[in-house]
Structure formats: C-alpha cells, structure tokens
C-alpha cells in the first residue's frame, strides 16, 4: 500500500489531517453521549452529524495515503498496529507512568495492552481464514447463522445464498453462543 506522498511534508500533513479528523470524530461521539445524558437531544444529534462528517474527512485523507487495501491487507495492517500497541506503545506508557508516580495508570495501560494483544490474535486468525479460503468453509461441521435473518444451517460450508432471506454467503458466520 505505497503512497505517492512518501517522504514528503505533504505526507506528514495528510497523516496529521487524518489523525486530527479521527480524534475529532471520537470526541464528538463522546460529547454527543454527554449531551444526550443531560437532556440535549438536538445537540447530541448535531455532535453525531458532525462526527459523521469528520469520519468522511478522515477517510479522504486515509485514502490519499493508500491506507485502505483489500481485506487481507487491512487485516495484516490492523494486526501490525495492534502488535505495536501492546508490545511497544502501552508498555512504554506504563513504564513512564510508573516512573512519574502513577502506578494505577500504569496498570491500566498494561490491562489495555492485554486487550490489544487479543485484538492482534483475532485479526491474525481472521487473516489466516481469508488466506486459506476458510471464511465460509471449514474442515469440520459447523453451525452457520445468517446475520440478516438468523437462519441456521449445519454443515462444513455456509450456503451461497440464504434460503430464507436471499442474502449472499457473505452474511453467514459460524454461530458462537456463549450464554
């Protein structure tokens, strides 16, 4: 996923624009939640509307940086990002927090790092499924569920088309009930 701006100030500007728009989007969704809790529905809705605008602005800059590949590339990039977060970023933050007298925050950084590790593992497992063409076909019998209508199929593969709602195979997932 090379980009034509590599090594330029424009690349740095695009990265900063992407980061700024991404952060604004998240802040505005948090602000919307607070406004809603305080009884300001219109203000909450406007924060969410603006957050959606910021998401689209961020997408413009991310696309310019060729940040969106195919699903396999995106899974690999996501796994790499999560790996950095749990192996380097959060551990470094934890060490600094401890040195500066914030042991509770250091512990929280490490707990989040453990979550990021799980995210990496999940993305790598999904990437393996994509690469092995095992997203919709397994070697063992599985229970498949249509994410649109809930239709259940038992077998080694999800159907090409849901016989109930006619949605494509892409709507099926292995059923995983944990309750």
Specify the residue positions occupied by each region the protein language model found.
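Non-heme di-metal
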Residues: 1-179
């Amino acid at each position: 996923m090379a980009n034509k701006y590599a090594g330029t100030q424009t690349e740095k500007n695009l990265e900063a624009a992407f980061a700024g728009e991404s952060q604004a989007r998240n802040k505005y969704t948090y602000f919307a939640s607070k406004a809603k809790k305080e009884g300001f529905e219109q203000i909450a809705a406007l924060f969410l509307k603006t957050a959606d605008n910021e998401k689209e602005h961020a997408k413009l800059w991310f696309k310019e940086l060729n940040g969106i590949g195919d699903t396999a590339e995106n899974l690999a990039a996501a796994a790499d990002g999560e790996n950095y977060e749990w192996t380097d970023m959060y551990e470094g933050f934890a060490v600094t927090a401890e040195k500066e007298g914030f042991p509770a925050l250091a512990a929280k950084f490490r707990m989040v790092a453990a979550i990021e590790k799980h995210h990496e593992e999940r993305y790598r497992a999904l990437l393996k499924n994509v690469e092995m063409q095992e997203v919709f076909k397994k070697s063992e019998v599985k229970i498949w569920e249509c994410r649109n209508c809930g239709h259940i199929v038992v077998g080694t593969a999800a159907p090409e088309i849901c016989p109930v709602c006619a949605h494509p195979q892409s709507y099926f997932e292995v059923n995983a009930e944990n309750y």
